[in-house]
C-alpha cells in the first residue's frame, strides 16, 4: 500500500541519516585527537587515553563498514559459509572475555551459563559474528542488568540462547527488527552504544545460510531472549 511504501521510504531516509552520523562521529573524534597530538595540545598524562579512544573509534568504523559490506555480499549471494565442527563453549568463552568490559561500562553483568564442552557445526567466524552482534544489542538496550549466554544440545542441532533483562520489545517491534531500516528505539540512536541498524538483518541471513533458525521471545520492560539453532551437519553454502 501507499502508506506502507511511505513508511519504508521514511525508514530508509532515517537509516541513511543515522548511518551518516555514525560514520561522521568517529571520524570527527579521530581527526580532533590527531590534531591535538600533532600540535601538542593534549597533556602528556592524557595521551595514552587519547590513543585508546582513537583505537576504539577506528574499530567502530571498521565494524560499520564491515556490516555494510556483509549485507551487500549476502544480498548479492557472494558470501560463502563453510561449516566445520568446533568447541562452541570455548568460542562463547572468548566472546564473553571480549565483551565483558563493554557490558560492565553500561552497568551490566555478562554471564556464560554453560561450562561443559559442546560442539557446534558452523562457520566459526560467522558464528562469532552472530553471537557478538546479538550480545552487543543486549548491552545497548540493557542498563544495570544481566545478559546470559547458554549453549545446549537439541535434536540434531545445537542451540544458543542469549537473554537480557533490558527494555524488551512489543510484538510489533519483534516483527520489524529484521527490516534493514528499522530501529527498535530510535530515541537511543545517539547513545555511545549506538549501531548502524544492519546487525539483525545480517544475523538472520547468516543463520539462514547455515540452514538454521532464529527466534525471539520478548516482553516490554522485562527483557529479550534470542534462540539460535545450528543443524549438526557440515555444509558448504555459496
Where are these regions (language model features)?
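Short acidic helix/loop segment immediately C-terminal to the autophosphorylated histidine
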Residues: 38-45
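Short conserved segment of the HATPase_c
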Residues: 169-183
Amino acid at each position: 500500500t501507499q502508506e506502507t511504501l511511505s513508511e519504508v521510504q521514511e525508514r530508509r531516509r532515517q537509516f541513511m541519516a543515522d548511518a551518516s552520523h555514525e560514520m561522521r562521529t568517529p571520524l570527527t573524534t579521530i581527526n580532533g585527537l590527531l590534531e591535538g597530538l600533532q600540535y601538542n595540545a593534549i597533556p602528556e598524562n592524557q595521551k595514552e587515553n587519547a590513543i585508546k579512544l582513537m583505537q576504539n573509534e577506528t574499530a567502530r568504523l571498521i565494524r560499520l563498514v564491515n556490516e555494510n559490506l556483509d549485507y551487500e555480499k549476502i544480498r548479492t549471494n557472494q558470501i560463502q559459509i563453510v561449516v566445520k565442527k568446533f568447541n562452541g563453549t570455548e568460542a562463547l568463552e572468548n566472546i564473553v572475555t571480549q565483551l565483558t568490559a563493554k557490558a560492565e561500562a553500561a552497568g551490566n553483568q555478562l554471564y556464560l551459563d554453560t561450562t561443559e564442552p559442546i560442539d557446534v557445526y558452523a562457520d566459526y567466524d560467522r558464528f562469532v559474528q552472530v553471537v557478538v552482534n546479538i550480545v552487543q544489542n543486549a548491552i545497548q538496550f540493557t542498563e544495570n542488568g544481566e545478559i546470559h549466554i547458554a549453549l545446549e544440545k537439541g535434536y540434531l542441532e545445537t542451540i544458543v540462547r542469549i537473554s537480557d533483562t533490558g527494555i524488551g520489545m512489543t510484538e510489533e517491534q519483534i516483527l520489524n527488527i529484521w527490516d534493514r531500516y528499522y530501529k527498535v528505539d530510535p530515541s537511543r540512536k545517539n547513545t555511545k552504544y549506538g549501531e548502524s541498524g544492519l546487525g539483525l538483518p545480517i544475523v538472520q541471513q547468516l543463520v539462514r545460510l547455515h540452514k538454521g533458525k532464529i527466534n525471539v521471545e520478548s516482553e516490554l520492560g522485562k527483557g529479550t531472549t534470542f534462540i539460535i539453532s545450528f543443524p549438526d551437519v557440515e555444509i558448504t553454502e555459496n
